[in-house]
Regions:
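Glycine/threonine-rich beta-strand-loop-alpha-helix active-site module
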Residues: 83-191
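C-terminal charged capping/lid subdomain of soluble metabolic enzymes
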Residues: 320-398
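ATP/NTP phosphate-donor binding region
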Residues: 2-99, 352
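Short alpha-helical scaffolding segments that buttress acidic/His motifs in well-ordered protein cores
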Residues: 209-213, 256-264, 278, 299, ...
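C-terminal catalytic subdomain
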Residues: 270-333, 339
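Flexible, glycine/charged-enriched surface loops at secondary-structure junctions
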Residues: 219-228, 243-255, 270-275, 289, ...
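Carboxylate- and glycine-rich phosphate/diphosphate-binding segment that chelates Mg2+/Mn2+
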Residues: 161-270
Length: 398
């Protein structure tokens, strides 16, 4: 059943409130842009790249120049967990931090937003989650100010008001939102992304393009989100294969970082689609599955399902043209372009079964998709059922 939406909405909103500094070498100048603060909680992942590549040292040098004290919390895992976020918030409270600085990939960005919220409010993160088994409480106070320094492209968290968080106990992966979760400052320095390994460049880059693919075919598109989405798709499609093949190609890194930022704006003035709901359920059950790879594994079956429902044929044709099929006339040309893109970024050989996914989980996953992030189904042009979602999982499975 199709939901009723306008082809394009000529009204839109824009509440993006982030000071953005984009360009190579910007991290070296961050002290010029940092807001006044007494003590920062620096949040990063439990990996080695931020420290090993010297990014953390550069940040600390700039904090010293600015006269801001700091403490480092470096325990964030991929698909950040509520328990880790609560621990980070406790550190921020104990150390009396008045600003949070995230440096790392999407997990560090999202975890930092959640830490910023919990650090300035009583209780724990899941008290404030509005979906699924969350406590649905309203925060008493605004989140602490956040500075975002992405070292990978992908989530667009440097430009949006949301954060994706996970709970292993409830098997939920959902999101929190709030105007105060926009970073006060985002430093987007493509030089920081040169060290990202090939496969993660591909996974994270696909997350970036997926935000805009979904943002262009959902039911709440507007002329503002369309502008961002098409330019994001063009940049990531044209330059991600180059970044995958040569990580030192700084122009490619810049264009992919720009596309990721634009995709963040798409989510801020529009939204994604239920493809993200399906993936969040998938990686909630299989925590080691990278989010971007989950989207890759689901994308062809998901978009093919919508194309067969003829919910927005012209938009899929337009995307096919932007993705290299200049004479596209059939919506299925988009699937052809998507399949080629998967090959170009070297992700066509991955399978769900590589990560322990089993078909007997699909029914439960489908219910989780609706329960934990059902809001995204409300913006789809087609009214999905649990059975539809199970079918997409099944067709994606290898």
């Amino acid at each position: 059943m199709s939901n009723e939406f306008l082809e394009t909405n000529n009204s839109f909103f824009d509440t993006v409130s982030t000071h953005v500094e984009f360009g190579s070498g910007k991290l070296n100048q961050i002290y010029e842009f940092l807001p006044d603060a007494k003590k920062a909680l620096i949040v990063t992942t439990n990996g080695k790249s931020v420290k090993g590549n010297g990014y953390l040292d550069t940040l600390i040098e700039n904090l010293n120049k600015k006269g801001i004290e700091y403490v480092v919390f470096d325990e964030i895992e991929p698909n950040p967990l509520n328990t880790t976020i609560d621990k980070g918030a406790d550190v921020a409270k104990e150390e009396k931090c008045d600003i949070i600085i995230a440096i790392g990939g999407g997990s560090a960005m999202d975890a930092s937003k959640a830490i910023a919220l919990v650090a300035n409010n009583p209780g724990k993160l899941w008290d404030y989650v509005q979906f699924g088994k969350g406590g649905k409480k309203t925060p008493q106070n605004k989140a602490l100010p956040l500075v975002a320094i992405p070292t990978t492209p992908g989530t667009g968290s440097e430009a949006d008001m949301g954060a994706v968080v996970s709970n292993n106990e409830t098997k939920e992966k959902t999101a929190i939102f709030g105007q105060d979760l926009f970073p006060v400052l985002s430093i987007i320095d493509p030089e920081l992304m040169v060290s990202v390994p090939e496969k993660y460049t591909a996974f994270q880059g696909f997350d970036a393009i997926s935000h805009s693919l979904e943002g262009y075919i959902n039911g709440i598109v507007n002329m503002y989100s369309d502008m961002y989405a098409l330019e994001a798709v063009r940049n990531v499609h044209d330059y991600l294969p180059k970044a995958v093949n040569n990580g030192n190609d700084l122009e490619a890194r810049e264009k992919v970082a720009f596309g990721s930022y634009l995709s963040g704006l798409v989510m801020s003035v529009g939204n994604t689609s239920s493809l993200h709901s399906l993936e969040h359920a998938l990686s909630a059950y299989h925590h080691d599955l990278p989010h971007g790879l989950g989207l890759i594994l689901l994308s062809k079956a998901y978009f093919k399902f919508l194309i067969n429902k003829h919910v927005c044929d012209d938009r899929f044709v337009k995307l096919a043209k932007v993705m290299g099929i200049e004479d596209a006339e059939d919506p299925m040309d988009f699937i052809t372009a998507l399949d080629k893109f998967h090959k170009d970024i070297k992700v066509d050989g991955y399978k769900m079964s590589d990560y322990g996914v089993s078909p007997d989980e699909f029914e439960d996953m489908a219910h989780t998709a609706f329960d934990s992030m059902g809001i995204l189904f409300t913006v789809d042009r087609y009214e999905f059922t649990v059975e539809d979602v199970v079918k997409i999982y099944e067709e994606s499975f290898e």
